[in-house]
Swiss-Prot record:
GO terms for cellular component: cytoplasm. It comes from Clostridium scindens (strain JCM 10418 / VPI 12708). It catalyses: 7beta-hydroxy-3-oxochol-24-oyl-CoA + NAD(+) = 7beta-hydroxy-3-oxochol-4-en-24-oyl-CoA + NADH + H(+). This is 7-beta-hydroxy-3-oxochol-24-oyl-CoA 4-desaturase. The keyword Ion transport does not apply. The keyword DNA-binding does not apply. GO terms for molecular function: 4 iron, 4 sulfur cluster binding; FMN binding; metal ion binding; oxidoreductase activity, acting on the aldehyde or oxo group of donors, NAD or NADP as acceptor. The active site is at 173 (proton donor). The gene is baiH.
């Protein structure tokens, strides 16, 4: 496909704004914000870098109209005039980089974290948010005041030189979305009840914003084309409302889908969802309005984006995570350099998930995210002979980074292929997109001249003979089998070996020990692989020949896995009849039985299993580094060889250590 002459990369006029192309950067929470409402340089850099990469517009999320009601702790704001100059500096940087800045103007409403300050969040009705704070139903007078605040924030955005603003009434979320959705709005006055009444807040918000900006200043509106919940707003509701939003002053509709609490996977579609999940709704809405309509939601392939725009289904696309993975996505696409595009696998592992170790937005495959200009693409001061031991995600990232900096890089891999434990992760249904990472890194490695030796078990003697100036140890991890009573007396089967295909489970009763990603995906894979014939030992015939039990010591399954992946998988396991035991400690095992201790201290035997699989995670494997330090000038240990964690840490550490050589 010739992207340079595609409709996707043709200009689009929206009011006074001329976009260079029809790819926008969707709003995403970065958690780089400042306590005073200003835009820190680190946050601004993210958007400036995507502007440099050719994105048509960049949208910063959650710019609040009232700092008393912050969205996520630190929240960017346009609630007072003194913030306009610094916001103008931000907008000017984006413009100089070739794009335009669009702030998403919001009042978080029920989603405000003000409850931690002993201030009740505001909402159309009393609702409990994710922080277990109950919102206070606001009065008519408060509604009018808040509407005026939206207008003033819109004015400030235009004064700051922003190309447009975006308003958010999707996902039954934040204040406007909560008013619009019957799932949240239980009012019985003129702002509740009927669809027209529920839309009143949104329409008045749009009208007030329009009154406070120039007549042709663009106002974008994000909506859920379908809330995809029983009792929620439907596509038919949005087909009715979309022309009303246009008449109120909206210049462009951005069509998302789903609701925040009932189905986050519809808002942030990850590995369990197909691409373009909201394109159908967007295309139907486009038929009833005369303004541009953009689709958003797992549009993670630029060629697919070009296809749906070329077919006239939508006027443009908003891409989020793919632009985190590769800020130069648009430039590379226009130049036809598709192999050069760093692929987003929709994993949600670092951009959506947060942890104590990584509380901000990161990207598995792009270690530069959040530090856009800290690691320039320049050669190393001196070219070194570098050995990387292990070709998993961390080893591959290290090899690529070192070679692209001008080092002479050799990779030794004990297996017959690259990928490491990622080869196990992609076995589970819906996770095959992660194979793109290894394809991409392999392409870059070969282009940079990396030399590979497979089926090569590294020894100190061989390393000494090679005489590298630096070694990066990326030997990964081995399956964890704790010294539980019985493990020495019976053959131990691991989930890792099952996922590797070392044995199959055609039918029978299966107990998987553990409740993390490996264990749950093993259960899922076993169910998918089972033969469909009825198995007649009293098991649920609806799931075929197999009956699966999970035993997890923690209070819930999939701790640490992002919600858009976690919740659908748990629902799937339950729907397939998997017996889930949480708060349950493993005391003893045989090859057919498991003795467990419940939370109340009682113990019992779970019996009659044909297979007992250990899926309790991994432990680091590093047999060489200490010896190598005796004769290699530089030795760096990365990833699971340090401590078993998710692949992102291996790739970040591989990048950083290789860049430092």
């Amino acid at each position: 496909m010739d992207m340079k002459h595609s409709r996707l990369f043709s200009p689009l006029q929206i009011g006074s704004l001329t976009l260079s192309n029809r790819v926008g950067m969707a709003p995403m929470s970065m958690d780089y914000e400042a306590a005073d409402g200003t835009v820190p340089k680190r946050l601004a850099d993210v958007f400036v870098r995507r502007a440099e990469g050719g994105t048509g517009y960049v949208m910063i999320d959650a710019v609040t109209i009232d700092s008393k009601y912050p969205y996520m702790g630190n929240t960017t704001a346009l609630d007072r005039d003194e913030l306009v100059p610094q916001f103008k500096e931000f907008a000017d940087r984006v413009k100089e980089a070739g794009s335009t800045l669009v702030p998403q103007i919001i009042h978080p409403g029920p989603e405000s974290v003000c409850g931690y300050r002993h201030i009740a969040p505001l909402g159309p009705s009393a609702n409990t948010n994710a922080n277990c704070h109950v919102s206070r139903s606001i009065s008519i007078d408060e509604i009018h005041d808040i509407i005026k605040q939206f207008g003033q924030a819109a004015r400030r955005a235009e004064e700051a030189g922003c190309g447009a603003i975006s308003l958010h009434c999707a996902h039954a979320y934040m204040l406007p979305g909560s008013f619009l959705s019957p799932l949240r709005n239980k009012r019985m006055d003129e702002y509740g009840g009927s669809l027209d009444n529920r839309a009143r807040f949104v329409i008045e918000m749009i009208e007030e914003a329009r009154r406070n900006v120039s007549p042709d200043f663009p106002i974008f509106l994000r909506i859920s084309g379908d809330e995809r919940m029983v009792g929620g707003n439907s596509l038919e509701d949005m087909l009715y409302l979309a022309p009303k939003f246009e008449a109120a002053g909206v210049s462009m509709l951005e069509v998302s889908g789903g609701t925040q609490y009932e189905g986050l996977e519809h808002i942030i579609p990850c590995q369990n969802k197909s691409r373009g999940v909201n394109v159908y709704e967007a295309s139907e809405i486009k038929k009833v309005v005369g303004i541009p309509v953009y689709a958003v939601g797992k549009i993670n392939d630029i060629r697919y984006a070009a296809e749906i725009v070329e077919r006239g289904l939508v006027d443009g696309v908003a891409m989020g995570r793919p632009l985190l993975a590769d800020p130069d996505l648009c430039k590379k696409a226009v130049e036809g350099q598709f192999d050069e595009i760093t692929p987003c696998a929709s994993c949600g592992g670092s951009c959506i998930s947060r942890s104590e170790a990584a509380p901000e937005c990161h990207c598995h495959i792009n270690p530069r995210l959040g530090r856009e200009y800290e690691f320039p693409d320049v050669p190393a001061e001196k070219s070194k002979k570098v050995l990387v031991i292990g070709a998993g995600p961390g080893g591959m990232m290290a090899a690529v980074t070192a070679a692209e900096r001008g080092h002479d890089v050799t990779v030794w891999e004990a297996d017959d292929k690259i990928g490491g434990q990622l080869n196990l992760a992609v076995v589970a249904p819906g996770k095959q997109e992660m194979t793109q990472w290894m394809v991409h890194l392999n392409y870059r490695a070969k282009k940079a001249g990396v030399k590979f030796e497979f089926n090569k078990e590294a020894t100190a003697e061989d390393v000494k003979a090679l005489a590298p100036e630096a070694v990066i140890v990326a030997t990964g991890a081995k399956p964890l089998v704790p010294p539980i009573k019985g493990t020495q007396d019976y053959p131990v089967l691991t989930a890792h070996d099952f996922l590797r295909g070392k044995f199959v489970i055609p039918k029978g009763r299966v107990c998987v020990l553990g409740g993390g990603a490996v264990a749950c995906e093993t259960a899922e894979t076993a169910l998918e692989n089972a033969r469909p014939n009825s198995y007649t030992r009293g098991y649920d015939a609806s799931i075929g020949d197999i009956d699966v039990t999970l035993v997890e010591m923690l209070p819930q399954l999939l701790t640490g896995v992002c919600a858009p992946n976690r919740e659908p998988l748990i629902r799937k396991l339950k729907s397939k009849g998997v017996h889930i035991n949480v708060n349950t400690k493993i005391m003893e095992v045989t090859d057919h039985e498991v003795k467990v201790q419940r939370q109340d201290g009682t113990q019992e035997w779970l019996e009659g299993f044909d297979y007992v699989l250990f899926g309790l995670g991994s432990r680091n494997y590093d047999p060489l580094s200490e010896t190598l330090k005796e004769f290699v000038p530089e030795v760096h240990v990365i990833g699971d060889a340090v401590r078993a964690r998710q692949a992102s840490y291996a790739m970040w550490e591989g990048f950083e250590k290789a860049y430092s050589l």
